[in-house]
Curated annotation (Swiss-Prot):
It is found in: Cytoplasm. PROSITE patterns: ACETATE_KINASE_1, ACETATE_KINASE_2. Pathway: Metabolic intermediate biosynthesis; acetyl-CoA biosynthesis; acetyl-CoA from acetate: step 1/2. The keyword GTP-binding does not apply. The gene is ackA. GO terms for molecular function: acetate kinase activity; ATP binding; magnesium ion binding. It comes from Clostridium botulinum (strain Okra / Type B1). GO terms for biological process: acetate metabolic process; acetyl-CoA biosynthetic process. This is Acetate kinase. Keywords: ATP-binding, Cytoplasm, Kinase, Magnesium, Metal-binding, Nucleotide-binding, Transferase. Its cofactor is Mg(2+); Mn(2+). It holds the Pfam family Acetate_kinase. It comes from the Bacteria. Transmembrane segments: none annotated. Catalyzes the formation of acetyl phosphate from acetate and ATP. Can also catalyze the reverse reaction.
Amino acid sequence: MKILVVNCGSSSLKYQLIDITSEEALAKGLVERIGIEGSILTQKVNGEKYIIEEPMKDHKKAIELVLKALVDKEHGVISDMSEIAAVGHRVVHGGEKYASSVLIDDEVMKALEDCVKLAPLHNPPNIIGINACRELMPKTPMVAVFDTAFHQTLPDYAYMYPLPYELYEQNGIRKYGFHGTSHRYVSSVASEMMEKDLKDLKVITCHLGNGASLCAVKEGKSVETSMGFTPLAGLAMGTRCGDIDPAILLFMERELKMSPDEVDTVINKKSGVLGISGVSSDFRDIEGAAEEGNKRAKLALDVYHYTVRQTIGAYTAVLNGVDAIVFTAGLGENSAASREEILNGLEYLGIKIDAEKNKQRGKQIEISTEDSKVKVFVIPTDEELMIARDTKEITVK
């Protein structure tokens, strides 16, 4: 059974065709510059690249070319579109309505439209991608898998902001959390590596990429997470500020005469480690600059590591202990130095790291020592596989 997994951005589209029986990705692809000059599709099959360069005025045209690439006689992996049993779509925001993945119908599409106000940057391209697929593949079942769904198990005292209650009731202002599919995947893999039931474990998962969030998992459920109403909250990130005093925004508007759009650009695109370092939002560049003596680059890393360490400490209190800590995503999987710095200062938890094992990059591995009281894992995330699994579960009766 083959499942197409689609992740639509505003001008890009990532996809994978997964054989769900073997859980193997048969093809992976990226479409860039949709609706912009220089549109390009790059597909990889067994390490071989296949490139299509032609104008793509919209996502429908992009999906057409994806399907064309998948069935291409020379470079494709299927002989006919009918081999695609179902399509799984990554959707950033499901609001309070969806605590799990769902089969897409007209009612679901309306609910996704209603969530646009909660995710104005992300949900519209997700919806456009779904509509394009439904138009081109009308008989193929489609499933929406939400970034927010895993966190719908947060208790009310964890998701409620101390604001007038009407803002929650009337406008849906509360903590939602994101990266849920990733947190769900790596926590389940950690339990497999420990040969224990996830329901018996307390796990802290650290999704550390350009966007970053932590999640506290208890009895297999998310009970706390660092992102909030939007993906801006929580940790310092590549270009996002994370948690700051909200009055700073008022100061920027009133005293610095910045418009709301200008403030938005600063806190979303010019802050985080980029803002502090003045070097880059890429941690590899910042680590390089810090090694060469750039003090602001070192400070940016120190702030970042501190916010992650601080949050891990808080989540051990939320969970009343911790059995495992998991690192995933770009930085979490590949930066031994960052993992070491983050865990440095958490020795009171009984954490001991094997320095040699910690040098591994991008591999699934336990990096704690045998006598460490808390297990520490590096687990490459696989959100696409999780989306494919959910899609199979919902469409195969």
